[in-house]
Amino acid sequence: MKNFIDLFSGLQRAHGCTYVEKKNADGTKIKGKSFVKREPVTEKHWQDHLNGIEPSLGIIPIDENNKCRWGCIDVDKYNLDHKKIINLINNYQLPLTMCRSKSGGAHIFLFTTVPVDASLMRDKLCSISAFLGFGNAEVFPK
């Protein structure tokens, strides 16, 4: 658990929460409610999140020094060919990790070994997002 928490380090004084209000028959989400909770993230928040207990946990990647160690491209396009995206990432040897999101889209992560300026992370992810064909995707950090 500690390695996972360290990997997704971010803002210490607040985090996001999401409740899924409706789901399709196949379990993908239709509608949810998200908000920011102004309290530190605890190990219980992480454990509940990993066990699928709502609310889902949303780590804010920008820390108190305006730095981050990870960022994410949030692709909300559905009927994605996830394997095609993974092959593109691998073919170009991009330092990215992709996973399917709850809604059937994709979360494409970039991790760094040291904290970098949040603006640099965002700029790089916006460029990568456009290169991958998802120029309109939401990018974190914001």
Residues covered by each model-derived region:
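Short, well-ordered loop/turn elements at secondary-structure boundaries
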Residues: 53-54, 66-68, 91-93, 102-105
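Helical (often loop-to-helix) elements that flank the catalytic cores of nucleotide-handling enzymes
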Residues: 82-91, 111-137
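Active-site-adjacent loop/helix surface patches within enzyme catalytic domains
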Residues: 73-76, 80-100
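DNA replication initiation on ssDNA origins
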Residues: 1-70, 79-85
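Short secondary-structure junctions
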Residues: 13-19, 94-98, 135-137
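Histidine-centered divalent-metal-coordination microenvironment in nucleic-acid enzymes
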Residues: 73, 95-121
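A broad, low-specificity signal marking well-ordered, structured residues that form hydrophobic/aromatic
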Residues: 55-57, 70-71, 96, 106, ...
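Short beta-strand
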Residues: 60-62, 96-103, 138-142
